[in-house]
Structure formats: structure tokens, C-alpha cells
Amino acid sequence: MSFHSGFVCILGRPNAGKSTLLNALVGEKLAIISPKPQTTRNRILGILHLPNQKGRAGQVILIDTPGVHKPDSSLGRKMMVEVREALEGCNLILMMVDAARRRDTADEFVLDLAKQSGTPVFLLLNKIDLLRGKKPELLSQIEAYSKLHEFREVIPLSARKKDGVDLLLKKLIEALPEGPRYFPEDQITDQPARFMAAEVIREQVLLQTSEEVPYATTVIIDEYEESKKLIRIAATVYCEREGQKGILIGKRGEKLKAIGTAARLQIEKMTGTRVFLELFVKVRTGWRDSREFVDELDWRRQLENLTSSAKSVQR
């Protein structure tokens, strides 16, 4: 039996369905999802373990990336750094496009990035469930894209309904080289639970607020204490203006309570443990343009700081 493995980068414009595909492939909710563009701000690793089929077993390390865009803030630039770092050293790119919308310069920008990497590319035409009865339109898109690049595979699918996902898995394992098992079989991501909790809270902010508020907020976990029967979490939701703070808190604190309740239930489902969640809201004017603050939002940087603090205490 041969064992195949490799790193696969999921690339696409905002709202192409990248995070939905990651969750569908792994079978767990690793990436938050909302109808709002640029929901994903960091690259997220999803580890897919494939059992032996026809003499081949494998491990696919999927990398979900922020939506490709031309940045206009420190946050946007950091997101594009995440994209470019994900492309480095990957074995395969899954370029996702929204088949239900007309191709434009944003899709061409994504394709240019993929071409520059020199890595083999699968073209995934997502959201085909929205094209029922429009097969000529889908075939026309496939023909048009095929003239722009020599794709390794072209696969129409619906990540939301999991149509075409089995075919994608088959083609993935065929395309990846023989290699080692990079992660243990019981591991499905590299993200610590405390940082996944921050994303769950931010997801509820995205779902329960509108206009500029979702884009002007971020979440930092201040305390995360875990025991067998209870996880205690204290988190701060940062926004940029007092008016946004008022919206997040709501009348008599009702909005913040609703966000906290929904997030707590989701974290309990994720961890299988009862959760006590305490939320605070603070104003950090212009945080999206503060390179220092944006860098501190990186969970890998936060993990390094926590490790350093723990070592200092031990001394």
C-alpha cells in the first residue's frame, strides 16, 4: 500500500466558498462562515485522513486562506501575507470560483496569484446548485477558464451540498506525491481551542450585526481556563468607535448577551464541555490600520507570547 500526502491551498476571492469547502472535506466546523466578505482573516489548517482505497491511503493538509483582494489597510495587507505564505511550499492549489456569478477582474487577480506560484491548480467551479437547468452556462464558464490556464483538473461542485466532493477527494489523492504522515490520525487542525473560541465569538458578531460593525470588530481571548467539567473564557470584542460599541452592547446589554449565548453554545458543542463565557467590549480607534495591533491578532504570535509568559512564571 502506498501513502500519499501533501499541502493543498484553497484560494479564491471573498465569498467563493473556501471555508465551506474546508468544513465539508474535514467533516468538522473548523472555519467560521458568514455571508459577509472577508470572514476568514487567517490561514486555517484542516487535516484530512483518507483510508486505504485501491492500494492508496493518504493525508491531505488543507489550508483555507483569506479571500484574495487588493488591501487598503494593515489588516488587509496582513490577510494577503497569510495568502502568500500559504502558497509557499504547497503541492497543489484549489482555485475556487463562484460559478453563479460572472467572471471579473477579482477572479483574474486570483488566477494570476496561482500562476505566479508555479504550482499545479485544480479549478473548482463552486455553487453549481444555483445553476440548476443552466448547463450551457456552466460549460461556457469551463471553456472560458480553460483558455486562461492549463488546469490539472476542472471540477464543478457545491461545497454547501457536498455535490462533487467525493470526486474532488479522489482526484486529490491521485495528484499528491508519496509522502509521510505529517500529523497524528486523531488531529484535524493545528489551531488551539482558545483561538477557535475567539473565531466562534467573531462569527456571532458577523451574523448578528450589520453595516460597518462586523468589519470593524475583532476578538481576543483574555483568559481561557480549562478543567474536566468546565471551561472559563473571558474575551474582549474590539471595535473602532463608541457608536459601534453601543451597537455591540445593545439596549440593556441584550445584543452582547445574544452574541455571548450563541457563541457559548457553539463552543460547548465544539469542546464537548460546559462553558462559562464572559464578554467585554472595548474601543480601539483605527485598529485595522495599526500594524502592531494587527500582528498581535495572529494566534501563532499570541501562542508564542503565552509560552514565553509561562516560562517566565516557571523561573
Please report, for each region that a protein language model flagged, where it lies by residue.
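Conserved G1/Walker A P-loop phosphate-binding module
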Residues: 1-89
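Conserved glycine(s) of the Walker
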Residues: 17, 164, 255
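Conserved, well-folded catalytic cores of nucleic-acid-processing
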Residues: 28, 47-51, 86-93, 148-151, ...
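Active-site glycine-centered loops adjacent to acidic/histidine catalytic or metal-binding residues
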Residues: 64, 126, 158
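Conserved Switch II/interswitch segment of TRAFAC-class P-loop GTPases
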Residues: 87-109, 118-137
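Amphipathic helical hotspot of TIR/SEFIR-family domains
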Residues: 104-116, 218-224
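Canonical P-loop GTPase G-domain recognition
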Residues: 119-120, 129-189
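P-loop NTP-binding site
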Residues: 193-315
